[in-house]
Every structure is written in structure tokens, then in C-alpha cells.
Swiss-Prot record:
Bias type Acidic residues, positions: 84-95
Stated name of the protein: rRNA biogenesis protein RRP36
Record-linked PANTHER family: RIBOSOMAL RNA PROCESSING PROTEIN 36 HOMOLOG
Quaternary assembly: Associates with 90S and pre-40S pre-ribosomal particles.
Annotated family: Belongs to the RRP36 family.
Coiled coil: 208-230
Chain intervals with Basic and acidic residues compositional bias: 22-31, 51-66, 73-83
Region span, Disordered: 1-172
Source species, domain of life: Eukaryota
Principal localisation: nucleus
Known role: Component of the 90S pre-ribosome involved in the maturation of rRNAs. Required for early cleavages of the pre-RNAs in the 40S ribosomal subunit maturation pathway.
Keywords assigned by UniProt, alphabetized: Coiled coil, Nucleus, Ribonucleoprotein, Ribosome biogenesis, rRNA processing
Length: 299
């Protein structure tokens, strides 16, 4: 008895249902026969043919992997171009609205790629770039002229005292030639002091301008004081050297350390009593501080 006749059950099934069941059974039998035949064929194959098939499969897999790597390494634009070429026959069949949408999205993607390229970090060894719209400054840098750190290259400088014009300049000669400028500086100081003392005038002026006048007054006073102190030191040293070189054939010149001591001695002798007391007190405190430091180290 076959499988079909064993599983027949009494019921109210139509003839069409019975026909469908028969077709299913026949299909199953055919599939079982095909599987058995394929198993028999594999059993008959030799080991050499199986090895050849295995090597062929491995080669195909390696080729697929290389293609995938190449596709990944390619730039995004090239991949898009190739994909567009492959999908060209399919896009021809699509409507015009679809093509317009794709163009719109392509434009957006190209813009994004352009922005990403701009944002990329430049190499530090790349040449410097500058816009052509930027104006060239009127004050140019002279190559080979090295200014000291204290001097600001942006400030205006008198060409008569510029290093690029010639050899080294003697400060004493310049001071002797342009000593009359001290009178103008003194007049400026007096004018600024009169402006600051006048309350009516300062109330009318803005606070920023008043602050700038105060700063300028302070700087001019300090500049004038330093110039006068330098002149005094030069005169003291000059007088001392003249007295020493009266009878001597060889000229005698003081060292820097000796000059400093001579100037300090002269200033101390020409001080008032109160000023001397202040100087002595300051020196005493300084000496005590040094002694305390020495005691701490010895501990």
C-alpha cells in the first residue's frame, strides 16, 4: 500500500482536493529521486576532480575579494560614475521626473564633496597663500635690518638715527646736537599739566582723552628725567677723567663698574640730609635681608 492510500480518511472532501494531494505526492517522489541520483554522482567522483573543483572555487573567491577592495579604494566620484553607467539603460526607461530628481541629488552630493575638500587641513610645508584684494602696506620691511625687541617696527622712526643709513652713531654727539628739544618737551609738560589742573576743561573732555593726556604726561616726564640723568653721569665722568689726565701722557678711562661707583658717590655727597637717611635705611634693610638668607641656608 502506498502512502496515499494509508492516509485516506473519511470525510466530505471534493475530487479537486484529492487531485491536489496526488500532485504533491508525485512532486515529493521526484525530488527524492533527484537527491538520490546527485548523491550517487558525488560518490562516483574521484579525489583529483574534487581537488580541482576546490582550487577553482578558491580562485573565484580571491578574485571577488580583490574586486571588492579595488571598489573600496576608488574615489567616490569614480564609483558614482561607474554606477551611473551601469544603471544608464534602466534610467532610460524611467520617466523624466525621475531623471530630474537624480540630477538634483547629484548636484547636492558634488557640493558636499567640494565643501569637504575645502575643509581639509593644509600641509605646513605648503606655500603661503594671500588674497589679491588685500592692500600692500606703505611701510615696508627692509631685508637684513634687524631691530631690537624693545623697538616697535610699526612705530615711525627718524631716518637720521636709522641703522641702515650708515655706521654706529654716538649718543653723546646726538644729544649735544638735539639738546634744544628738551625746551619743547618742558613746554609740552607745562601745557598738559595746565589742562589737567583746569577742572572746567577736563569736565568737557571725554574720559578717554583725559586718560591719554595723563599717560603722555607721565611718559614725557620720565623720558626727560632719564635724559637729564644720563647727561649728569657723562659730565661727572668727563670731569673726573679730565682731572686725572692733566699731567698724564697716556689717557686714562674708567671702567663701567668704576663709573657707577663714582656716580653713586657724587649723588650721595650732593644729597640732602633727609634723602641720605632714606638711602641709608634702604641699604640697611637690604643688608639684613641678605644676612637672614645666609642664616637660613646654614641651618
Amino acid at each position: 500500500m502506498s502512502y496515499y492510500f494509508k492516509n485516506i480518511k473519511p470525510g466530505v472532501e471534493s475530487e479537486s482536493d484529492e487531485g491536489e494531494d496526488l500532485e504533491r505526492l508525485l512532486r515529493r517522489n521526484n525530488q527524492d529521486d533527484a537527491d538520490e541520483s546527485s548523491d550517487d554522482e558525488l560518490r562516483t567522483l574521484s579525489f583529483g576532480s574534487l581537488k580541482k573543483a576546490d582550487t577553482m572555487m578558491k580562485k573565484e573567491e580571491d578574485g571577488d575579494r580583490k574586486l571588492n577592495r579595488k571598489i573600496k579604494d576608488k574615489p567616490s566620484k569614480q564609483v558614482k560614475y561607474e554606477s551611473e553607467q551601469e544603471s544608464a539603460p534602466e534610467q532610460e526607461s524611467e520617466s523624466e521626473s525621475g531623471s530630474s530628481d537624480s540630477e538634483f541629488f547629484e548636484e547636492e552630493s558634488s557640493k558636499k564633496n567640494g565643501d569637504q575638500k575645502k575643509k581639509k587641513k593644509r600641509s605646513k610645508h605648503a606655500p603661503a597663500e594671500q588674497s589679491a584684494k588685500k592692500r600692500v602696506s606703505k611701510v615696508r620691511e627692509i631685508p637684513g635690518l634687524h631691530l631690537s625687541k624693545s623697538q616697535n617696527p610699526n612705530l615711525y622712526q627718524d631716518i637720521r638715527f636709522d641703522k641702515s643709513t650708515g655706521g654706529p652713531t654716538d649718543s653723546s654727539v646726538i644729544r649735544r646736537r638735539y639738546g634744544f628739544l628738551d625746551e619743547y618737551r618742558q613746554k609740552e609738560i607745562e601745557e598738559m599739566e595746565s589742562i589737567l589742573h583746569d577742572r572746567k576743561l577736563t569736565s568737557k573732555l571725554p574720559p578717554e582723552e583725559v586718560e591719554s593726556i595723563e599717560r603722555r604726561l607721565k611718559s614725557t616726564k620720565s623720558r626727560l628725567q632719564t635724559m637729564k640723568s644720563k647727561d649728569l653721569e657723562q659730565n661727572i665722568v668727563k670731569d673726573y677723567e679730565q682731572t686725572m689726565n692733566k699731567d698724564n701722557k697716556n689717557k686714562f678711562h674708567l671702567k663701567r663698574s668704576e663709573r657707577r661707583k663714582l656716580v653713586q658717590k657724587w649723588k650721595f655727597e650732593h644729597m640732602k640730609s633727609k634723602q641720605r637717611e632714606k638711602v641709608m635705611e634702604r641699604k640697611r634693610k637690604k643688608r639684613l635681608g641678605k644676612e637672614f638668607k645666609q642664616f637660613e641656608f646654614n641651618k
